[in-house]
Amino acid sequence: MRLFGNSKEQGICQVGESDVAVSEIKKDEALLQKMGYKPKLHRTYAFFENFASSFAACDCMSNIRGSFYIGLLTGGPSAYWITYIIAIPLQLISAATMAEVCSALPTAGSLYFWASAAGGKKYGRLIGFIVAWWVVVAWTSFVAVNCQSTTKFIFGELPVFNSGFSVSSSDVKFRAVQWAVGEAILLVCVLLNFIPPKWFRYIFRVSVAVILLDFVLNMIWLPIAVSTKYGFRDEAFMKSTNYDLGKVNNGWSWCLTFFCTARILVGYDAAGHVAEETKNASKTASRGMFYSAFSNAILSTGIIVMFLYCLPPSNVMYELIKSNSQQPFVSFYAYALGKRAHVFMNVVGILGMIFDTSLSIVASSRLVFAVARDGVLPFSGWLRKVDSHGQPTNAVTFIFLISAALLCSNLPSAVAFTSLLSAAAVPTIMAYAAVAFGRLFLSRNDFPKSEWSLGKLSKPFQLITFLWNLFTAVILFSPKAYPVTGKNFNYAPVIFGAITIFGLISWLSIPASRWSTFYDASKLDSNSFDDSSSDKKSLEKAASIAEGSITQII
């Protein structure tokens, strides 16, 4: 990591306007140069694009629907809404903590870079290498999981229309068809990422619009249909429990409902990944991160209440869960809205997931680019290259290749791929905990100041973030079915352990000289860019790079 060192890479700063002023880049390129990096990515995105990257990565609609039935089986309705009430404020505190860090260090490396900084001079390199592998694997897995989840909503239609085609995950022929569809979805999402920034910004807008349309339809159309068909659930149902995990303590079964509710907002760090492409990043990226999490929290509150009250009678509900092994929510929509009418609702959700995946590739590719820029990954020299539009297209290709390979794991065994669901979330959650831990104990008084500051709440929020994310990781590591067998074993701890070992191997094999020395925190203060002569010189140098290397974005 070239934090405050002389970068050997010669980069360009691409901008959308040829008359860019020094004042517009003084808190972006100047801060980036003080972190040791020359600007290479385009910087054309504003608040909305930054906000949309995290808003789509979280997408509470897809997150809730994807695992809603699991919560009903582990603890029941009361466990679901109670754990949600507990989880959402704690997730928002975590988002606020990460947003404060993002404001101080707005770089594409995001969690990797922040963890390195939080680790201090003594442990920064070690923590940075481990977290780098955590988050790269997590975000790459996230892309593959999104594609697979989308296929589940597609094939969930077959039981509704009584198709004779098997949709059992134990059927290798079905898994082959599902794999092919998942790969096709991945290809579409990747191709969208080769659109120049000038036009790609519309993908951000469409993604947010589809999610909001999805929300509005569920808040208006669904309750109207339910009220005329079978009516809303009563208070007794909302207070009921259901422990369907076999021989396991009911208290722990209740806690496992956090598997659904504690991960609703995971992914808000996407705004940090695109920080180097965002104008006035010290403020804009942190605001985009927190407000996207807050917006998803508001939407998820309304939608969870609506879903719980709109569920069909219990005997019908559990029959729907059993009859549609791919995605019970599709059968729920069909029962409530009608066999034909529900298709429109499902198509809106599927489109939302496709756009979500495309924006997740944006975030993950920027992360890969930033980690490769510091030489942490294999083939770093190739991965850190950008195209004429200032986009890391080689990193996008890398995401495509790895995600495609991960999708192939579904061919021999459905169990292996199911474990990716936890593997995609756990490393990110542990990275949140690592950043908070480092700031609390390793760089308590040395971390750069933030423009978006939590003030006196900063330390308490860091402690809460650390403890909460550790608890969440324990939940995601736990078995989800009992007794534990080879078919239902949760491989997330095994995958996480392997990722950590790869991080340690990288730390041991890559010399510290190739990663450079650590930063001087006193010089990395995003609030300290005044009009002093030294800062003017840095700004003029950054402006010179920008003006001398402009490529018009088409």
Curated annotation (Swiss-Prot):
<feature type="transmembrane region" description="Helical">
    <location>
        <begin position="288"/>
        <end position="308"/>
    </location>
</feature>
<feature type="transmembrane region" description="Helical">
    <location>
        <begin position="457"/>
        <end position="477"/>
    </location>
</feature>
<feature type="transmembrane region" description="Helical">
    <location>
        <begin position="176"/>
        <end position="196"/>
    </location>
</feature>
<dbReference type="Pfam" id="PF13520">
    <property type="entry name" value="AA_permease_2"/>
</dbReference>
<dbReference type="GO" id="GO:0015171">
    <property type="term" value="F:amino acid transmembrane transporter activity"/>
</dbReference>
<dbReference type="GO" id="GO:0015185">
    <property type="term" value="F:gamma-aminobutyric acid transmembrane transporter activity"/>
</dbReference>
<feature type="transmembrane region" description="Helical">
    <location>
        <begin position="418"/>
        <end position="438"/>
    </location>
</feature>
<keyword id="KW-0813">Transport</keyword>
<feature type="transmembrane region" description="Helical">
    <location>
        <begin position="343"/>
        <end position="363"/>
    </location>
</feature>
<feature type="transmembrane region" description="Helical">
    <location>
        <begin position="492"/>
        <end position="512"/>
    </location>
</feature>
<feature type="transmembrane region" description="Helical">
    <location>
        <begin position="206"/>
        <end position="226"/>
    </location>
</feature>
<feature type="transmembrane region" description="Helical">
    <location>
        <begin position="126"/>
        <end position="146"/>
    </location>
</feature>
<dbReference type="GO" id="GO:0055085">
    <property type="term" value="P:transmembrane transport"/>
</dbReference>
<keyword id="KW-0029">Amino-acid transport</keyword>
<dbReference type="GO" id="GO:0016020">
    <property type="term" value="C:membrane"/>
</dbReference>
<keyword id="KW-1133">Transmembrane helix</keyword>
<feature type="transmembrane region" description="Helical">
    <location>
        <begin position="250"/>
        <end position="267"/>
    </location>
</feature>
<feature type="transmembrane region" description="Helical">
    <location>
        <begin position="397"/>
        <end position="417"/>
    </location>
</feature>
<comment type="similarity">
    <text>Belongs to the amino acid-polyamine-organocation (APC) superfamily.</text>
</comment>
<dbReference type="InterPro" id="IPR002293">
    <property type="entry name" value="AA/rel_permease1"/>
</dbReference>
<protein>
    <recommendedName>
        <fullName>Uncharacterized amino-acid permease C794.03</fullName>
    </recommendedName>
</protein>
<dbReference type="GO" id="GO:0015812">
    <property type="term" value="P:gamma-aminobutyric acid transport"/>
</dbReference>
<feature type="transmembrane region" description="Helical">
    <location>
        <begin position="95"/>
        <end position="115"/>
    </location>
</feature>
<feature type="transmembrane region" description="Helical">
    <location>
        <begin position="68"/>
        <end position="88"/>
    </location>
</feature>
<keyword id="KW-0812">Transmembrane</keyword>
<keyword id="KW-0472">Membrane</keyword>
